[in-house]
A protein has these predicted regions:
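Membrane-water interface at the C-terminal end of transmembrane alpha helices
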Residues: 121-139
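Membrane-helix boundary connector in multi-pass membrane proteins
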Residues: 85, 95-114
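Juxtamembrane helix-break-helix junctions at the cytosolic face
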Residues: 67-87
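Hydrophobic, membrane-facing alpha-helical anchors
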Residues: 18-21, 36-45, 61-73
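Hydrophobic alpha-helical transmembrane segments of polytopic
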Residues: 16-23, 62-66, 88-92, 96, ...
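Hydrophobic transmembrane helix segments
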Residues: 23-58
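Cytosolic juxtamembrane helix and N-cap/initiation of the first transmembrane helix
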Residues: 1-26
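Helical transmembrane-bundle signal
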Residues: 20-31, 70, 74, 93-103, ...
C-alpha cells in the first residue's frame, strides 16, 4: 500500500528554510521555558540577563543579532542564488552549531533543545554541503 504514495522531491532551498524555521522555534520555546526557572523573572526585573550579566544596550544588540541571523536565513535560503546560498548556510550552520554547543545551560530542557538545535544546524550544513549539482538533477 505504501508503494502507491506519491513523494515529490523537495528543493534544497526549501529544506534549508524549513530547518532554519525549526531552529527559530526551538530558540523561542527554550527562551520562553527559561522564564519559568526560579528567580529568572526577578533577575530580568533587576536588569540581569542570565547568563550574560547586566543588561546593556550592547548586550541586547548582540542577542538581537544572534536571533536575527537565523530569522533572516529563512528568507535568504529561498532567495539567494545557489553558490552564495550554499556557502552562507555552511558557514552560519557551523557557527550556530558551535555557539549552541558552547552556550548550553545545565537545565535539562536547555540541553534537550540544544541537542535538537545542533542536529538542525548540522542538517543545514549537510544539505548545503551536499547541494545537488545541475548534472545530477537532469538524470
Amino acid at each position: 500500500m505504501t508503494a502507491d504514495l506519491e513523494d515529490t522531491r523537495i528543493p534544497v532551498k526549501l529544506k534549508l528554510a524549513a530547518l532554519w524555521t525549526s531552529v527559530m522555534f526551538c530558540y523561542l520555546y527554550a527562551d520562553y521555558f527559561g522564564l519559568y526557572i526560579p528567580g529568572s523573572l526577578q533577575k530580568m526585573l533587576d536588569g540581569i540577563m542570565e547568563p550574560l550579566g547586566p543588561t546593556t544596550q550592547n548586550m541586547l544588540l548582540g542577542t538581537s543579532l544572534m536571533m536575527a541571523i537565523p530569522s533572516v536565513m529563512i528568507f535568504l535560503s529561498v532567495a539567494l542564488r545557489p553558490v552564495p546560498n550554499r556557502w552562507l548556510n555552511i558557514v552560519l550552520g557551523t557557527l550556530y552549531s558551535l555557539i549552541i554547543l558552547l552556550t548550553m545551560w545545565s537545565w535539562r530542557f536547555y540541553i534537550f533543545f540544544g541537542v535538537i538545535e545542533i542536529a538542525l544546524t548540522g542538517l543545514v550544513v549537510w544539505h548545503a554541503w551536499n547541494w545537488p549539482r545541475a548534472s545530477t538533477l537532469k538524470q
